Amino acid sequence: MSEEKLNKNSERAVTKDTGENSQKIMSEEKKNYSDTLNLPQTDFKMRGNLPQREPEIQKAIFENGLYEKILKKNEGHKHFVLHDGPPYANGEIHAGHALNKILKDTIVRYKSMKGYYSPYIPGFDTHGMPTEKKAIEKLGLDRNKIPVPKFRDTCKEFTKKYKDIQTEGFKRLGVLGDWEHPYITYDPKMEARQIGVFGDMYKKGYIYRGLKPVYWCTDCETALAEAEIEYKDVTSTSIYVKFPIVDGKGLIDTDDTSIVIWTTTPWTLPGNTGITIGADFEYSLVKVNYKNDESKFAGEANSDLNVDDKKQIKENNKKAVDGTNSEKLILATDLVDKVMKLAGIEEYRTIKTFKGSELEGILCKHPFLNRTSRVVLGSEVTVNVDLVEGTGCVHTAPAYGKEDYLQGLKDKLPMIVEVNEKGIQQDGAGPFKGMFYAKSNKAIVEWLDEHNFLLKSEPITHSYPHCWRCKNPIIFRATKQWFASIDGFREDTLKAIETVKWHPLDWGKSRMYDMIKNRNDWCISRQRTWGVPLPIFYCEKCNEPYVTEESIAKIQEIVKNEGTNAWWEKTAEELMPYNAKCPKCGCTQFTKEKDIMDVWFDSGSTHQSVLVERGLDYPADLYLEGNDQYRGWFQSSLLTSVATNGIAPYKEVLCCGMVVDGQGKKMSKSLGNGISPNDMSKKYGADIVRLWVLSSDYEMDVNLSDEILKGISDVYRKIRNTLRYMLGNTYDFDPENPVKYEDMQEIDKWALTRLNKLIKDCTKDYDNYDFKNCYHDVNQFCVVDMSSFYLDIIKDRLYTEKADSLLRRSAQTAMYYILDALTKILTPMISFTVEDVWKAMKHTKNENVESPMLADYPVENKEWDNNEIAEKWNKIIMIKDIASKELELSRADKVIGNSLDALLTITAGTEDYKFLKENEKIIRDVLIVSQLKLVENKNAKSVLKNADKNNVEGNFEIKVEHAKGEKCDRCWQYFEHLEDGLCERCKNVLKQLN
């Protein structure tokens, strides 16, 4: 590189003063002493050009096997295993992936530099509905018209494509790992291990088949787990419906009396078999009078009712004609006024009150079906009746809700499922047969109104579950499914939670604890084909399930060798043990289960299929994912691990938030506010993306926008310039021959105390996963301690002293130590930039020069801890802060051009004057002024008294004048006497050079 280019590039290396002074040196043609100055020299460019440079570094890193070399270096050391939660391989990576993977890479890099053997095996989740849906959409497939093995092969090829795309995306972000051998959930060895986990749980009695309500997506036609549900606000119709009493148990006259229920899901009324009330609540029998002689009696126009019901209605109508236009309603006492007002009923009075428990067993006529609904008592475990909304009388359909199901079990209510897998109402839905459930809502409300069963309807906005993949509303629907019984190991799981270190501690642990304590059994079956089959056979004669240790072992062996396609390609006889017989009836003919395992069972089993299978540590040291994984991967992994081995699969759990845009809105294609990592890397560089992640409060939702990235880029430039300045000024330094600490200049010793603090603080930050604090520590060190102070002050020594002088080498020694440690601290952060810094640096003979990742993380040097120097320099820094303000004002007033043009007079009290006088030369150098004059004022108070507490009391009296004498042509300081335009020092240096 030419000297002219070097000098130009050094202009803005650190501070404004440095730039101005360097420029002036080069611009003065009449007496150009530039060839006598030690100007910075380095191949490390001022501009990073990261989008162009990083791919070159990335190529070299992976071609040279850096990851493998890191593992080899730390072989035999203590392990640290971060187990990767697998992203779905069904699309390109997004900003959330970048946040996740960069956090993981930062931790693994840091641990590796600390000497830990820290393998990182990236994973890919490839099975299940997420992939099926994408493959069907993008390839235009109809899974019902393609043979299962062919459809599965198509899905596999689809996931392979995106696995490769995502791999390149993660590598572009600088993520190191075993990318040649990732774990992929369609890998036959993994599938076989997963089947083994299922077998272990089945053997222990934790797996069962049952008919109960589950989340069901009518679009995807499959059951869903809680982790596959998203909630959105929707507007529904809430209705108040009259159920006429047909058997009052001698307590209530059935004559024109109804119980009023409330529901927001009219489509579930065909499944109603009960009305749940609160045992301890008070209920009122309320007589209501209607205006305008308009009959409101339930069922007046219902032609489908039987003869007795019609007789009752006729009697009611007769009363209406006689002027008795009234009826009686039962609802919770506390809600009477609210409901009457809502229904527009002005005339009503309470006839009688009852305790809820007295009403148990009363029978009501279903509004449009020829059956009765029984009054039952709720509880905290079943239907928990409240007096906040509705009527205190809860519509109960055991087939369509968790609490309803439990209520039905308790009170032996019939479970009637009238909606099929596509969401269509069936024969038992009466007049609504053949309707899609959502459309039947309106039809049911209109029918109830027309037939006078509807007291009131109104819109209500509430949070409602939606499918995570197709984004459509889902329903609760009772179907036969396979479940993992959480009750079987719930207490063990709660105990295991106590053994884990959770981040954030304040709510991470309690969140998981509450989820496990209150969760339902886990529905593990899915009505899809792309996944690991449930390894279950059924007796053709009696339908008894067949699962044995032998059958599991044989399926595992077949799958390991042939993959899970074998389940669909082979007969049951080929898959089962020889001479298998039904344990119940002795039959030897079997059929295979058609469903696959929940995709969360896939990833939730990786503690066995990856950690144990690959000989890694189990439990892992750390799981790190988004906070949505408390109900996803964190939980499924915990459940399968405790169920099979009695322990949590992880020692620590760390979670991050979601990525949102600059205004805090969720990123989405429809809003057009998403920024892809690929686009960010092309525009700004991956190191900027990494700094964005590490500068964020990642445990909360993380904002991302172009403005934020531009701000991060500015910080990056300051850090880069600091590194470049030190590289440029250590070009001729020999690391094998540093200046001993005791021989170093005091300011250089001070710089090393600051470095020691940086090492200490950043080590603590990395250990605590507090990357934001580490980022700020580094930024503060580079901008405040180095660029604005230390490096600005020592430039005179670096440029003008003899190259091998003790003064210059002392500064170089400090800079070398700082550059070395700072580069290593930055290595987990800006992983591309540091590779170039490392190659531009000087190194000791024994140091690995290939990459900073093969170096050890810096440790504190106790020799550099010097409290006396730290306290003294606190005062000097305060003096500089006070004086700099006056110098800036004088510069603005054109009294001086730069600080070297100044004669500075400081008037101070006796105590401060003494300190100033003792350190006069140091302070002059620190202030970067040509001349310093000190004046004592015995009446002035001490300004520096509490400097050790970073507290300045008042100000010095400071006067700024233009310096006296002439300016040295070489160092630009002013002196009373010059010889041939040179000061005494510069003249001596030139003599030595000649």
Name the predicted role of every residue range:
Residues 2-7, 28-50, 54-56, 60-64, ...:
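Residue patterns forming the tRNA-binding/recognition surfaces of aminoacyl-tRNA synthetases
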Residues 72-134, 261-263, 375-407, 411, ...:
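N-terminal catalytic cores of NTP/NDP-binding nucleotidyl/phosphoryl-transfer enzymes
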Residues 125, 214, 218, 224-232, ...:
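Acidic, turn-prone loop/beta-hairpin segments
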Residues 376, 951-978, 987:
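C-terminal accessory/binding modules appended to enzymatic or scaffolding proteins
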Residues 274, 281-289, 309-393, 402:
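Protease-associated
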Residues 411-423, 528-530, 549-701:
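Alpha-helical recognition segments enriched in aromatics with Gly/Pro capping
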Residues 74, 78-85, 96-99, 103, ...:
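Secondary-structure capping and boundary motifs in well-ordered enzyme cores
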